[in-house]
A protein has these predicted regions:
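C-terminal, low-ordered peptide segments at domain boundaries
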Residues: 144-266, 289, 314-323, 412-430
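Extended, small/polar residue-biased N-terminal targeting/export presequences
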Residues: 49-109, 167-169, 173-179, 184-224
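Gram-positive cell-envelope targeting signals
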Residues: 1-51, 61, 65, 92, ...
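PDZ/PDZ-like domain segments forming the peptide/carboxylate-binding groove
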Residues: 92-152, 220-224, 244-251
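Extracytoplasmic/secreted cell-surface and envelope-processing proteins
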Residues: 120-121, 146-153, 179, 249-253, ...
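Terminal peptide-recognition signature
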Residues: 43, 64, 68, 101, ...
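Gly/Ser/Thr-rich loop/hinge elements
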Residues: 201, 208-230, 278-334, 338-341, ...
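Short acidic catalytic loops
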Residues: 133-140, 241-242, 260-278, 334
């Protein structure tokens, strides 16, 4: 969703009860409350000090008072109420609530099942693992009272009627269905799930027909083959390490996966960054230190940031730990158009320090034209909280560059660079035929 300065300000103003009338086409109002004015001035101060581009005063005040439609801030800038910001902080730590599913935009197709969530654990009793590419086609209080949810709107409506602690029955199908007749012909499974708080895990590893992850509930690195299908695809001298996001306990989980890789004595590792939209910069640096083959021994630069003041800051890993687990190994990367930000920065560090070449990167081609790319996000955001109110804003604060100075903002990593296109119907199919194709190509 495109967020302009006007839209961000509308959140500030509505939450703070700042003006009587705000939106476009309405005259200016002088009905300011003291607390609201303080919030607005604080917000402007953050933009002036930290936003990576200059925002003229007249553009800011026109957006605030007259409701102009200009796109003054970029799409990544966002305002949070105190409650929203607290929730965001918790989610960045991996602490979630609900059933544990995310969907592709405007669809009832699953984009992700959070590892460690109620739906993840429900896979144990399902006829097949509940994961990316399935469709949520029924929701109800019992298996006999399922309401068909063949569209996003119907699915969202039904899901929203269940709160924390409530149990719901969910029906999943392996293909999209638009009618009861199509449903009867589709492969489906129904599970019972209770909405609850959980801590998400962000790393899934597979080799030798087994899948592993660190489950926060059990506080242990364990075999989760009965919950996922990834184990069924990975055999031979290969291993797959899927990194979902750079959040929560991902850095420690990544090390657990590398230790398992060492124990399994495999020679080839596929780092799966498909649909990884990025995350925390510190976690990125902690993970990158294991993936930068020819980097300096100490404090290797993972990326650097340029701020509008002209200041440049290097963000570095503590050490080059590549040889701890990957010495003499072959590493490949899988990515797609949803691979963004920290994921692209990690790819950049791996390329610049000789861990992989562009030819070792596989990109999802959904158009069948031989061209594919990652998202192309070469800017970073920083959140700033107002200590007086608890509200916060997330603003784009800097441009980011690979160690060699390359910026992929607006471009991404592409097949034009030498990366390899792999055909797929979409960015999330069940079963994962794209992964099977990649594994076939890299099998020694």
């Amino acid at each position: 969703k495109n967020r302009t300065l006007r839209l961000v300000l509308s959140c500030v103003l509505s939450v703070a009860a700042l003006v009587a009338v705000f939106f476009a086409g309405v005259g200016a109002s002088s009905l300011f409350y003291d607390d609201g004015l303080k919030s607005l001035l604080w917000f402007k101060e953050q933009i002036d000090k930290t936003y990576y581009q200059d925002v003229p005063d007249d553009a800011f005040w026109n957006a605030a008072i007259q409701g102009v439609e200009d796109n003054v801030l970029d799409i990544y800038s966002q305002y949070y109420t105190a409650e929203e910001f607290d929730r965001t902080v918790s989610e960045n730590q991996g602490i979630m609530g609900g059933f544990g599913m995310a969907f592709f935009s405007g669809s009832n197709k699953i984009a992700r099942v959070s590892i460690g969530s109620p739906v993840f654990y429900a896979s144990k009793t399902a006829d097949f693992p509940i994961e990316t590419g399935l469709y949520l086609t029924g929701i109800g209080k019992s298996e006999g009272e399922l309401v068909s949810t063949f569209t996003y709107d119907s699915m969202a409506k039904e899901l929203s009627s269940y709160g924390a602690g409530e149990t719901v029955f969910l029906r999943f199908t392996t293909m999209p269905v638009a009618s009861e007749a199509e449903l009867s012909a589709a492969q489906s499974t129904v599970v019972s799930v209770t909405s609850a708080e959980y801590t998400e895990s962000y790393v899934l590893y597979a080799a030798d027909s087994k899948a592993w992850t660190y489950l926060e509930r059990e506080k242990v690195w364990q075999d989760v083959s009965e919950y996922v299908s990834l184990d069924e695809q990975v055999t031979g001298d290969l291993a797959v390490l899927r990194l979902v996001e750079f959040n929560g306990n991902a850095a420690a989980e990544f090390v657990y996966a590398l230790q398992q890789f060492e124990k399994d004595a495999k020679q080839t590792l596929l780092l799966d960054l498909r649909n990884d939209g990025g995350g925390n910069l510190n976690i990125l640096c902690n993970i990158a230190q294991y993936l930068m083959k020819d980097a300096p021994a100490s404090n290797p630069v993972v990326l650097y940031a340029k701020y509008k003041s002209g200041m440049q800051i290097n963000y570095s890993a503590g050490a080059n730990l590549y040889n701890s687990y990957l010495s003499g190994k072959k590493v490949y990367v899988a990515a797609n158009g949803n691979t963004a930000s920290a994921s692209e920065a990690l790819m950049g560090a791996m390329i610049d320090y000789g861990t992989v070449s562009y030819a070792d990167i596989f990109l999802t081609d959904t158009q069948g034209k031989g061209f594919a790319r990652t998202y192309g996000k070469g800017i970073m955001q920083t959140s700033y909280s107002n200590p007086s109110t608890g509200e916060a804003v997330k603003l784009t604060s800097a441009q980011i560059f690979w160690p060699n100075g390359n910026s992929i903002h607006g471009k991404g990593v592409t097949t034009d660079d030498g990366a390899v296109a792999v055909s797929a119907v979409s960015y999330g199919e069940y079963p994962d035929a794209e992964l099977t194709e990649i594994l076939n190509r890299i099998t020694p």
